[in-house]
């Protein structure tokens, strides 16, 4: 059985991956630029791979996954739909994705600090997610 910090960190990463996948899926249909669509699709697939890895680890540890915070999910959905209705271009998509990734990096970094006793593999997985989200902010900058 994993220590409590490991379990909590993995659950938070699981919720974060779900939020990331859903957020990218919410905007993919509105993307016009082929390269931006490719960037987002590839990143979504990477999030899904990490999500599958997390799911497998959580199952082996006999732990349930965690859903994203309903309020955060609702606020994200509202912001996305309002902004896409108002402006609805690739720049808006890049802006929304950048904001979402920055929030993800901030939350994941907080979990690294909060769950100090988490096992190294859980910390490494969290860092991989941070790197993935940070890289996406870099990749979408030309579209801002």
Role assignments for model-derived ranges:
Residues 1-7, 61, 84:
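Membrane-interacting alpha-helical segments
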Residues 2-31, 92-116:
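Alpha-helical bundle segments that constitute or directly flank the non-heme di-iron/ferroxidase center
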Residues 5-13, 34-49, 90-96, 121-132:
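Alpha-helical scaffold segments that form or flank carboxylate-/histidine-based iron centers
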Residues 21, 51, 55-58, 79-82, ...:
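A structural signal for well-ordered alpha-helices, especially hydrophobic packing surfaces
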Residues 25, 29-36, 59, 63, ...:
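Short, flexible helix-adjacent loops and helix caps
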Residues 37-71, 140-143:
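Conserved alpha-helical segments that form or flank metal/cofactor-binding pockets of metalloenzymes
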Residues 56-105:
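Carboxylate-rich helix-loop segments that flank metal/cofactor sites and access channels
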């Amino acid at each position: 059985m994993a220590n409590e910090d490991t379990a909590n960190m993995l659950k938070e990463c699981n919720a974060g991956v779900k939020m990331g996948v859903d957020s990218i899926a919410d905007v993919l249909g509105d993307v016009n630029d082929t390269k931006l669509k490719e960037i987002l699709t590839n990143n979504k697939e990477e999030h899904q791979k990490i999500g599958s890895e997390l799911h497998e680890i959580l199952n082996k540890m006999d732990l349930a996954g965690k859903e994203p915070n309903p309020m955060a999910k609702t606020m994200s959905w509202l912001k996305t739909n309002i902004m896409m209705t108002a402006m609805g271009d690739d720049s808006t998509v890049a802006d929304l994705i950048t904001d979402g990734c920055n929030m993800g990096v901030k939350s994941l970094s907080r979990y690294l600090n909060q769950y100090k006793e988490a096992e190294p593999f859980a910390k490494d997985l969290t860092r991989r997610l941070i790197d993935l989200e940070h890289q996406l902010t870099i990749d979408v900058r030309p579209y801002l």
